[in-house]
């Protein structure tokens, strides 16, 4: 099937992938008066007296805004907010189908950080959570931090944290097969944007011994010239041996390669310089940093990609719906590091030890256990962290 042509045809047929359905049925005078005026005044007054009632008397408790400025849409780059709408609608479909979360797409026409933050903050009272999507780095870091400081609902940039959670789940299981502990492993992440930095942070929280991030220039280390603020910050807590040079030099002697970068940047020769039984997660789409057959021929024990036509797909859809489901269920005020870690372990747990193999380290996207398992783990972590409000 030519997915591009067929998708374009179907989008024209669908004329939008989501729609609004009424939960309150209005079919006579009484039902009209209850759903709208005059009856609707009573819940309005109740919320006026206590804004927290908005979670009980409206759909806010289950509503998430999926918000972009269109500056980093898929691999298409800065294509503008309107052009990002098909992706935002698609994300909303995934929220509903995989997490039973009602999500609404919002494409904001500004590249100014403060203007974007103010816009999102001003509408946040309508939602139980905010999912930031396809916002360019390093602006995405500043936007998320400012919104987290202003809002009393979860702010979650899925390109960062959803990816980090799934990669962490993959490595929790991969290390079972390699017989190595994360605390003994060194990883190299090629790509130091939103996903790469978030992956590094979460893996270090999980106990990874060390990680080297690389960009187009090569290894990132403290004191390297011309680093943006986000790279400067991550350089202070990574690459403890101050490795310098190219990607190939950084990868030598490592146990794990994680690619969130560009096609074909990793070669068989470079993989051969890694430690025994290396793990290669080559997630560039649609063409990975190295093809799975090439990586395995070079000695990789486990290979994952971002594609569904190869084993071990690293797909955020196994993470973000359940994470938000759990956060919404306990009316969490934020999504903490412990909630992300709980999600990673929950996802990993869905691959039974007797079924775990080099070609099966993550549950499949359509595994019906994912939503409830991840949601419960996240909700329990929220309670332990004191951010649950029910």
Predicted regions and their residues:
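Adenosine-phosphate binding glycine-rich loop
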Residues: 158-159, 282-390
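General beta-strand structural signal in soluble alpha/beta enzymes
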Residues: 105, 131-134, 155-158, 189, ...
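Glycine-rich phosphate/diphosphate-binding loop of Rossmann-like nucleotide-binding domains
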Residues: 74, 79-99, 151, 157, ...
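Solvent-exposed alpha-helices and their adjacent loops that cap or buttress functional pockets
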Residues: 12, 55-60, 96-97, 122-124, ...
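Short, ordered loop/turn segments at secondary-structure junctions
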Residues: 69-71, 79, 108-109, 134-137, ...
């Amino acid at each position: 099937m030519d997915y591009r042509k067929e998708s374009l045809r179907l989008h024209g047929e669908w004329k939008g992938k989501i729609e609004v359905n009424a939960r309150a049925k209005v079919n006579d005078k009484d039902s009209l008066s209850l759903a709208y005026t005059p009856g609707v005044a009573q819940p309005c007054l109740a919320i006026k007296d206590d804004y927290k009632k908005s979670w009980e008397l409206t759909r806010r408790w289950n509503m998430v805004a999926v918000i972009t400025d269109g500056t980093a849409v898929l691999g298409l780059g800065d294509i503008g907010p309107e052009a990002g709408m098909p992706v935002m609608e698609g994300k909303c479909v995934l929220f509903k189908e995989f997490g039973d979360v009602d999500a609404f797409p919002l494409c904001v026409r500004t590249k100014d950080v403060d203007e974007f933050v103010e816009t999102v903050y001003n509408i946040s009272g309508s939602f139980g959570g905010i999912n930031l999507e396809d916002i360019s780095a390093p602006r995405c870091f500043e936007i998320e931090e400012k919104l987290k400081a202003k809002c009393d609902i979860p702010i979650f940039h899925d390109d960062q944290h959803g990816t980090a959670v799934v990669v962490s789940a993959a490595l929790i299981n991969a290390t079972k097969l390699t017989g190595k502990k994360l605390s003994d492993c060194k990883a190299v992440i090629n790509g130091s944007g939103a996903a790469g930095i978030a992956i590094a942070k979460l893996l270090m929280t999980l106990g990874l011994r060390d990680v080297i991030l690389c960009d187009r220039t090569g290894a990132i280390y403290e004191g390297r010239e011309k680093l943006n603020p986000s790279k400067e910050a991550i350089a202070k807590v990574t690459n403890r041996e101050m490795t310098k040079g190219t990607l190939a030099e950084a990868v030598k002697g490592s146990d794990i390669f994680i690619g969130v970068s560009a096609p074909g940047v990793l070669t068989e020769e470079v993989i051969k310089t890694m430690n025994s039984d290396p793990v290669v997660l080559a997630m560039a789409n649609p063409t990975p940093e190295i093809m799975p057959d090439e990586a395995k021929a070079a000695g990789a024990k486990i290979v994952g990609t971002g594609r569904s036509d190869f084993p071990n797909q690293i797909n955020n859809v196994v993470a973000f719906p359940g994470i938000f489901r759990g956060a919404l269920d306990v009316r969490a005020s934020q999504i903490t590091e412990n909630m992300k870690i709980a999600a990673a372990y929950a996802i990993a747990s869905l691959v039974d030890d007797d079924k775990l193999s080099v070609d099966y380290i993550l549950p499949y996207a359509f595994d019906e256990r994912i939503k409830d398992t991840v949601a419960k783990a996240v909700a329990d972590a929220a309670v332990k962290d004191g951010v649950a409000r029910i």
